Amino acid sequence: MCYTRVYLKNSGMELAPDAPMLRREGSSAAVCAAGLLLSYELRGKDMRKLFLALALAAALLAAGCGRSEQGAQPQTVSRPVVESAERQFTAPAAGQTVAVFDTSAGVFKAVLYPDLAPQACENFIGLVNKGYYNGLTITRVEKDFVVGAGQGADGKGTTIWGGSRYPAEYTDRLHHYSGALCAAADAAGECASVFYVVQTLPDSVSQELTDQMTAAGYRAEVIAAYQAGGGAPYLDYGDTVFGQVFEGMETVDRIAQAAVDENQTPVEPITIHSVSLSSYEAAAAAPAQ
């Protein structure tokens, strides 16, 4: 999956026929990223789209090297409690739909946002109810970036609509913060069953990236949330954010530590035993003293 190619196509930036595919692993990332940017012909003057394209390439330049060491030195990620009024950092309301991912590496839970990403949630919930994800394995692990799955035995994704994909859904109320549950879009800007969780570190948003978000017109509240919790703003408006992990992020971090092969697939399979749905139950209020 090439996140950069997906984003730029969705952004109205035209990809030249001979543009190279951008890769994240290995020292070739710098060469590919530079070649990719030079191969794009920008259409229009949307500063946010331009920022996202350049920021993604810059992030890949920084993160492209050293992937072969992944899994060698497990680390514990300390994640802060982010104080923000942004939707993804507010506690789920009682009755909200929650997806429970039971994997061989542990369990994590994500609250879904059908009001903001209706098609993504409808498709995901429908596939969960059919048991589609049960028994699948994690197929994409990029430490400090994303953990993904959702491809069937044929290596492809599917939908509840007979395989017909749905267009990616965007909103300024959902972003690629650490822990975001996202539907991956293809080069045509369409999504299916493949999903990923953003696994970036809390300090992943540099001052330079912050300055670029400001210049691109991001809301101050969004920038502050990115600064506090980390994330991948260069993926915004490319893929669909439809949920947020609120419990078990340590499991996602554990999966991200796995040793991977040249395709970023775990050497030792990590199985999704099941994905199930439940309704969030708010903690009972403490009795008055």
Stretches with model-predicted labels:
Residues Y3, C65-Q289:
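Cyclophilin-like peptidyl-prolyl cis-trans isomerases
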Residues Y3, K9-G12, P17, R24-D46:
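Short, Lys/Arg-enriched N-terminal segments with co-localized hydrophobic residues
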Residues R5, S11, A16-A19, S28, ...:
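Exposed boundary/loop context
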Residues L8, G26-S27, D46, F51-L52, ...:
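Sequence-pattern detector for short linear motifs
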Residues K9, V31, E41, L50, ...:
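Low-complexity, intrinsically disordered regions enriched in charged/polar residues
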Residues M21-L22, L60-L61, Q151:
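Hydrophobic alpha-helical membrane context
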Residues K49-R67:
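Sec-dependent N-terminal signal peptides of Gram-positive bacterial secreted proteins and lipoproteins
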